[in-house]
């Protein structure tokens, strides 16, 4: 094109430019303007979308005359004092006197589970009830969280408060009778020191438009291929020459009249070139374009200068050949210089082509003029030619002519092979000149018609090239998009009907193992009773009938410019992502930038480096020291020192070179701007980074990541490169990818994670590496329900099992057939692993779906050591599975296992009444699957069975109407789009701040003495379900166990180490009113929801409850109760959540302080048995207190006066 432009300029200066020159320049300018318009389409910005502003209703405090004004009764006289007012000293005096009267009242005897006889009461007629509370103080001043009161005064909460505040008339105490006091478990309330939450909404969330790095499709950079001489014989040449002279061309034996319209546009110039299927016939992208007949006469001086330039070029080519021989590098283009000589010689001798005219002298470089739609200049005469695949710029070029072994690359063999090839009957690989009226009639859209399961559909994709194509002379000329051009040259268009054979049943002819001619059965060529392939004319009687599914052949139309890279699931099979700049497409926008290297700052940046076409840099910076780094530096030095050859590669070749570990070739391909994220169906959507990780090449992984490879790309099995490194046991590659940001918790299609594979192969360092990130779930289950510890048990990796147990692996999780890891350990016969699991409190009597215990499996497999271990740990050999077999029935007679089971049976009969008891599991899950984790029940103290005198529930229930305000429109909610970690979260503001850290634990500064109210995000919030402010509503996450204590009946203990601030469980039971609590007989499970007098509500876990009903009192508690609101915000009905107040060891009993109000009533019947040094309610502590009071009784002057008592903090 540059030569054509120079010749045109010279002719115009002399005033002798022919008419064709003016048309040439005009057409070039028109095409350049069209290309600029198309190029600018990719840079058109998107319209910015913003979401409407959503502002919640602000909190309006209730006015003085509001009907929801809350008053709290202080004292026994029923005087109402507004909330927040400080009670008078006189009221406190009356309260103290009232408490003193209770000790002498008549007490109704309840059925407390943990009871001991006490001294007889002093008489009286006032019944009492024991209720647990949130604090240890007998009474606390009426205080409440100021923000919560504003919530209560909202219009939605007013009705519920008014409706629920009326006490039932049936339970009203008559006048003159003292108020009934009940012993309740209570908790402390937040004081007035908690600052009110400002009534404001979070600021408007700014929606920033993410600027996509859009790379529009670049113009095609390669020129038309150099013509090659046909050595198929003189007959063919003479025939074509005569056809050219006569102006008529006959391609088939059909009617030549169908070519009349085309011949009118084409003119006299016509040449036909047939391209072989070898890789070596691709043409260099820097080959010079030819412009024929720009002028008929040139001066002799110009011809002499042209001959001198040709001689200089020949000398340069000879120098390049010598350099190639010295370097010894073998490439696909080793015979390129020889072929260039042959082409030049042929170009001079051939009578078909007029001699080309070059510029007189070389001019300084100018700005490139815009090319036509097809990437070549619009000048020159129109010709009908079949061009090589390389010049068509097709994305599937590499699949048409692969480089097969044994194919010679030198020119002589190519000419010999070309001589034996026959001219095909079809014209699938021929290009006709541009016909403007055809493209304009089609609206510059693709004219292809696809045949899909017998149905026809058209393609409306935009075209890049206006040259026309057709499969045969029986089909009209049409302009095609790049996708259908690629399929046309692959002979996938039927020559009979002109439809593309996309999906359905077709015939395929294979004249060569590399080529498949596809056509319809009804479109075969018939002659003298024989059928022939309409493509090649071969006998079609042996053509294969193939059925192509819809997913394989249907390819979406290729657009001219893509706004953003498509997702991986929508990639066209076997095609590169053309929306990004590649080796043969240049984007008009900003080039892609590789991700920054996080290790670059820690390693010396000195060393060789290469700059990629996309702006990235290849260097050894960030690569750990070792052989891999040395090899990479050596490869970079070689690329810097040697003269780089201009080669052409298919994107799929990068994967193959990476798989073979060819570092030099990989760098060369990356320098040719091959896409490091290219995925093909032939490799199951695997990227080159997958292949590098599979091979274990750290240096290739390094250069691919520097070139912009996606470290978390997934293949068809959803496997990432990090998973490939773990599966293939490449520790260094895995460590490097973890440091570079590889996702360690992603899951495959079957649910397996990297930790599953590491545990399966037994690489302890790999497991330690993954666990050290803190991002993997040690109890993750795959599609079969198997956890990493189950895989390790099955493959006998005992050290991996020990490490997983130290990191919190749950040995009670079951797979899809309800097997636990102990079942798999017994299946493999590893007694050592089984003992480790049993020491980790694994259930020896667990049964799977078939009713088999680990003993059944070990006996069936005849593993003697496992059977002895299970029998020594108390396994019951008399248990039967679902088929009615015991372990003894499954054992071969007279075997070692059979004798062991027989001996154990006799020993069990002999020691049936032994004095020492061993702890045994009497229930595998008291929650019956209602909790996230199973809660087993064990008893090693007596023969008491698992308690069944209650109904296990996981949430509070009601047996009467409570009028709880659950209206979703009354909920205060946040509009966060993140994980609610910012200070703008409204739910966090309601709680003063969000009190949870990233692990869902309470912060260190949380007030454990007077816990504030916590408002978690609810169903009205805009945040995700897994946001940071949703802890209690996620349920129990720690492993607990119900066990029989020696002195306090049933208790609850931890089966794992629990850090401080961790959510344990919720106190769940039946919601009842205070009046209802006064008439209930058993008050051992009452928990007061508020710490003030008046109409309050309680939770009774006597008949309905969860595991928390078994938590005992501890004077030195390790858990604390906190009021939490989730599904509603009715302040009368908070939910009681228990959090750990300190670190809890494995096997330690859980307990909280019931409160002094509880022990004021219950201390007359039993005393505390916690055994703590700080115990305040044991028999010894009570005796010491009574002795102290007795000594002070004769000296009343030593007692402090009420007026001198310090005021109670509010």
Curated annotation (Swiss-Prot):
Changing residue 786 to A: Abolishes binding to histone H3K9me without affecting the histone methyltransferase activity. Residues 817-819 are annotated as: Histone H3K9me binding. Residues 1038-1155 form the SET domain. Its main location: nucleus. Zn(2+) 2 binds at residues 974, 987, 1017, 1021. Keywords: Acetylation, ANK repeat, Chromatin regulator, Chromosome, Isopeptide bond, Metal-binding, Methylation, Methyltransferase, Nucleus, Phosphoprotein, Repeat, S-adenosyl-L-methionine, Transferase, Ubl conjugation, Zinc. Methylated at Lys-185; automethylated. Residues 1164-1180 form the Post-SET domain. The record marks 1067 as: Histone H3K9me binding. Residues 1-23, 105-128, 155-165 have a biased composition (Low complexity). S-adenosyl-L-methionine binds at residues 1048-1050, 1085, 1112-1113, 1169. Expressed in all tissues examined, with high levels in fetal liver, thymus, lymph node, spleen and peripheral blood leukocytes and lower level in bone marrow. The modification N6,N6,N6-trimethyllysine is found at residue 185. Transmembrane segments: none annotated. GO terms for biological process: behavioral response to cocaine; cellular response to cocaine; cellular response to starvation; DNA methylation-dependent constitutive heterochromatin formation; epigenetic regulation of gene expression; fertilization; negative regulation of autophagosome assembly; negative regulation of gene expression via chromosomal CpG island methylation. Residues 972-1035 form the Pre-SET domain. This is Histone-lysine N-methyltransferase EHMT2. It comes from Homo sapiens.
